[in-house]
Amino acid sequence: MAKKITAYIKLQVKAAQANPSPPVGPALGQHGVNIMEFCKAFNARTQGIEPGLPTPVIITVYSDRSFTFETKSTPASVLLKKAAGLTSGSARPNTVKVGTVTRAQLEDIAKAKNADLTAADMEAAVRTIAGSARSMGLNVEGV
């Protein structure tokens, strides 16, 4: 018989830098999960990602206090800010533009996010990322 699922926990943890401090420790501790075991497994799985990039993770906790987790790709907004060299998006994106991204940068981001996007093809994925860029107050060149 399959194990009974008791909780799903969604967090954003910096790649290869998980530690028991908040938000990881309290979120896992209240469900009785071994925090250090999660931190070691997460850090091992995210070794290939640039350290410090926020990585969404969905943790499934079972009734016997065991867990499994699935990592997602870094949010598009973080990748767009990195590509444009910004620390934050525009407070008024329709009127104040804070930076520019090129089609080549959008294609790179779309390739990195492809597994998590529901786009039918690469062109649709690029348009999706371009829409995110515009909503952050970035000018989009070539789309």
UniProtKB/Swiss-Prot annotation:
GO terms for cellular component: cytosolic large ribosomal subunit. Coiled coil: none annotated. One of its GO terms (molecular function) is large ribosomal subunit rRNA binding. GO terms for biological process: translation. InterPro entries: Ribosomal_uL11, Ribosomal_uL11_bac-typ, Ribosomal_uL11_C, Ribosomal_uL11_C_sf, Ribosomal_uL11_CS, Ribosomal_uL11_N, Ribosomal_uL11_N_sf. It holds the Pfam family Ribosomal_L11. Keywords: Methylation, Ribonucleoprotein, Ribosomal protein, RNA-binding, rRNA-binding. One or more lysine residues are methylated. It comes from the Bacteria. SMART domains: RL11 (SM00649). Signal peptide: none annotated. Part of the ribosomal stalk of the 50S ribosomal subunit. Interacts with L10 and the large rRNA to form the base of the stalk. L10 forms an elongated spine to which L12 dimers bind in a sequential fashion forming a multimeric L10(L12)X complex. Belongs to the universal ribosomal protein uL11 family. Forms part of the ribosomal stalk which helps the ribosome interact with GTP-bound translation factors. This is Large ribosomal subunit protein uL11. It comes from Pseudomonas syringae pv. tomato (strain ATCC BAA-871 / DC3000).
